[in-house]
A protein has these predicted regions:
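A short, solvent-exposed, low-complexity linear motif enriched for acidic/polar residues
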Residues: 1-158
Length: 158
């Protein structure tokens, strides 16, 4: 899951499909979102300052990036944030890969944001991210220990 490092920092407006999707590009990190899931809970999301917003988002992407591919520099990111998902798919014609959103957010409150941008934007200090990253079997930030095993993806027989 995610965009390979060598393609992650191309110019989205000049890229070929599917990398031409600018809604999946993070201008502030000059790279693509590896996963984007946005929900609009009924009643909105309460922020710490008691204001509300309409969506709670999960945007998984590389962070801590330096360098500019547009100027020919090599881009290096301190946290690639690409989960490794291994599944046993033995009969692709009769099986499908399933993403369980409920498992992804089961320890998160979609009605209450803990600060910053609503939901998890992959930041190492974003309080809404640790449980999301745990569900994906990843560590959060550049020096974190990953949680063994992901709980979000599975294989089902058709």
């Amino acid at each position: 899951m995610g965009v390979p490092s060598e393609l992650n920092h191309e110019d989205a407006s000049a890229a070929s499909a599917p990398l031409n999707r600018t809604d999946l590009f993070w201008s502030w990190q000059s790279g693509y979102k590896h996963l984007r899931m946005d929900v609009a809970p009924e009643g909105g999301v309460l922020k710490p300052d008691n204001s509300t917003t309409t969506t709670w988002n999960i945007h998984l992407g590389s962070t801590g990036c330096v360098g500019s591919a547009q100027t020919g520099e090599t881009v290096n990111c301190s946290a690639d944030n690409r989960p490794i998902i291994e599944l046993d798919v033995s009969d692709i014609a009769n099986q499908q890969i399933v993403i369980d959103y409920g498992k992804l957010v089961e320890n998160s409150s979609l009605l209450n944001d803990q600060g910053g941008a609503p939901g998890c934007m992959s930041g190492p200090t974003d309080l809404d991210c640790p449980d999301i990253f745990d569900a994906l079997g990843m560590g959060l930030g550049e020096n974190s220990d990953p949680t063994p095993g992901q709980t979000v993806f599975s294989v089902e027989t058709l």
